[in-house]
Amino acid sequence: MFGKAGLGNLMKQAQQMQEKMAQVQEEIAEMEVTGESGAGLVKVTINGAHSCRRVEVDPSLLEDDKDMLEDLVAAAFNDAARRISEAQKDKMASVSNGMSLPPGFKMPF
C-alpha cells in the first residue's frame, strides 16, 4: 500500500504531529479566559483545565438579590467555559494544518 518512502514520510508526519500536539496541550493548560455576564458586572476567569481562577463582582451587585447574583456568576462561568472550549478547538485545529490527512478525516477533539 505504501512504498518505503511513503511510509517513512507518513511516520515523520505522525511524529511531527505528536510533538506539536504536546506543545499545544501545554499552551492550552496555560491559557486563561474571562467570561462575563450582566454587561460585565460579573466576570469569571478560568484556565485551560476549566478550573476557576478568579471571580469579580461589581460592588453594586452586592446590594441586590442573592438569586440574581448567583445566576450572573453561573452565566459568567458558562461564558468562560464556552470561550475556553472555542480557544482549545482553534488551537487543536492548528495541529493538523499542513498535514496531508485523508479526505473526511476528523481529529479526535
Curated annotation (Swiss-Prot):
Keywords: Cytoplasm, DNA-binding. One of its GO terms (molecular function) is DNA binding. It is found in: Cytoplasm, Nucleoid. It comes from the Bacteria. The keyword DNA-binding applies. It holds the Pfam family YbaB_DNA_bd. InterPro entries: YbaB-like_sf, YbaB/EbfC. SUPFAM superfamilies: YbaB-like (SSF82607). Its main location: cytoplasm. GO terms for cellular component: bacterial nucleoid; cytosol. HAMAP family: DNA_YbaB_EbfC. Binds to DNA and alters its conformation. May be involved in regulation of gene expression, nucleoid organization and DNA protection. Belongs to the YbaB/EbfC family. Homodimer. This is Nucleoid-associated protein ETA_24730. It comes from Erwinia tasmaniensis (strain DSM 17950 / CFBP 7177 / CIP 109463 / NCPPB 4357 / Et1/99). The lineage of its organism: Bacteria, Pseudomonadati, Pseudomonadota, Gammaproteobacteria, Enterobacterales.
